[in-house]
Amino acid sequence: MLTLDKFEEASEKVKEVVLPTNLIYSEYFSEQTGNKVYFKPENMQYTGAYKVRGAYYKISTLSEEEREKGLVTASAGNHAQGVAYAAKLYGVPATVVMPTTTPLIKVNRTKGYGAKVVLHGSVYDEACQYALELAKKEGATFVHPFNDEVVATGQGTIAMEIFKELPTVDIILVPIGGGGLAAGVSTLAKLLNPNIKVIGVEPAGASCMKASLDAGKVVTLPSVDTIADG
């Protein structure tokens, strides 16, 4: 369960690894929308994305024995680099399974942080299934990119920073891919202000959340069409 205590704990822990990403006021979008619009530039993190938050916090909760057995994850890019970088800081071995279609630059950057990269499957789901099997075989901890409450708690620390810098915030727009960021941010935002509105935004070509809400159950799309590859 995602709780305020855990979010506060995670917020302190991720300070060890994240760079400050102060809100940036957008005059253009403020004029276009008739609102005061700010951006939270998480692309300025060392690994290029917020994903390191969840990965770093996840590792911090593991026992020494679990860390010694290593980590396994699956990702097409950003989560891979987040786990690899966080694992390097903790001195923990990490294996990242990436689809064979992953851009070479993301593969090389993940390797650059010290992780072992295994290319398997043409899509994320195939890579993920193989990673789960590998983690079980090796007795390692599988760090899911989104379907993990600890990881989601780490991602949600973004909301804590937003509220500290802009206490009067009344709407937060959050991107949705797997849903880990949205789960963390929306949960913490509602804990801090029950009246706040959180709006999830996803690519039209990868709208699994909308499809799931419309169907009233989890829906898996046969394919996606988006440049946001994870």
PLM feature spans:
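PLP-dependent amino-acid enzyme catalytic core
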Residues: 1-230
